[in-house]
Amino acid sequence: IITHKLNPCVGYSRNNNLLVELAEHDIVSYLQSDMVISSNYDVDVLSELEDNCILSATRIEPPLHGESSQTITKDFGTDPNEFKWDEFQSYSITAKQARNIEYFFAPFTFYKKVWMDVGGYDTLFRRSREDSDLLQRFIQKGVKIKQTFKANVYHFSCVTSRGKNWFDPNSEEAKQRVQTQNRADQIELMRFIRKWGNFNHGERKLDRYDMDLVWKTGTIEKLAQFEFYFNRVWLPTQEIKDQLLALHKTDHSFANQLLKFTDKDWENAKQFYNQIDYNEIYQVGEPEGYNIKVEIDNTSLDTFLSGIASLSAILEEAEPGTYELGDVRINVENKVNLAETQITVTNPPFDHSLLTIE
């Protein structure tokens, strides 16, 4: 049993990284706290595990998210105190199938080396998107992604992350928590796009081209809608830079609220989390040299914004030259794909004296 002295919590990403780091055996199997394994779960996952592979088991879930090809929808309860244990165990045996798909989600099993080689979860992500980031790094590195229907668990579905009864439309507390989580998730999504240039959950490798945005005029509110697609953002004045920096001062407030961090708690704990250096991203003036430069000068952005999520795909076929996307100019000197530089994450070192191992 491992406990900690860091108030109020270690955090999801760090917690799982420590789980793997401190594991004494070569194979690690991870379950979330709102999951119940089926009979012979260990035998089932070990029979499907391969080298250089992340193996997910299949989730059996109550009908809260709708049907999907990765899960089995069957209601055995949404409250652990009312869980139909015997019925689930009987059903779980009949639900097992000798088939696999390519998908990644908890619960998962893997060789410890596979996890350690990419650095585990990126502590940049505090409330969501850490799985998608880890999956993208596995794909970039060539790790096999596999989900088996031979092993399954019952998943109470987001009770851990969203709270008990998060789905209850009559609970004001639950609705408020979901709203706060949604706002936190939007911040995490912007962090993901800033890192990878776009978002997906492992459907394909992402290309992260090195790009500079030159913003000559326009509102801060408009700029904030898309500047996270770029590695550096060049601004006309220090005043505008200061305004952008001020927008990010509350980035962690929603995660802190959900995780019950006080301001003092966060000041003590933030040293253990990766964070974005916005002072390096936001620059005043224009770049002297660049690989790809996007210039925006008081133009209509409708066409550009509708196509920005496809910008990496557009650039994939582009030769050096000048292009237009709507009224926006795109200058391509070189195409430098930074995706491979994101594969291995380095998290700040953790103070192991904060842990008690029994």
PLM region spans:
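Glycine-rich, basic loop-to-helix element that forms the pyrophosphate-binding segment
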Residues: 6-23, 270-273
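Short aromatic/hydrophobic "clamp" motif used to bind/position activated sugar donors
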Residues: 28
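Active-site acidic Asp-centered loop
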Residues: 31-34, 104, 122, 295
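Acidic donor-binding/catalytic loop of UDP-sugar-dependent glycosyltransferases
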Residues: 34-48, 293-309
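Conserved donor NDP-sugar-binding/catalytic core segment of glycosyltransferases
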Residues: 35-79
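Active-site-adjacent helix/loop segment of glycosyltransferases
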Residues: 63, 69, 136-212
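Short, flexible, basic/aromatic active-site loop/helix in glycosyltransferases
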Residues: 74-101
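A short, conserved alpha-helix in the catalytic core of glycosyltransferases
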Residues: 102-119, 124-152
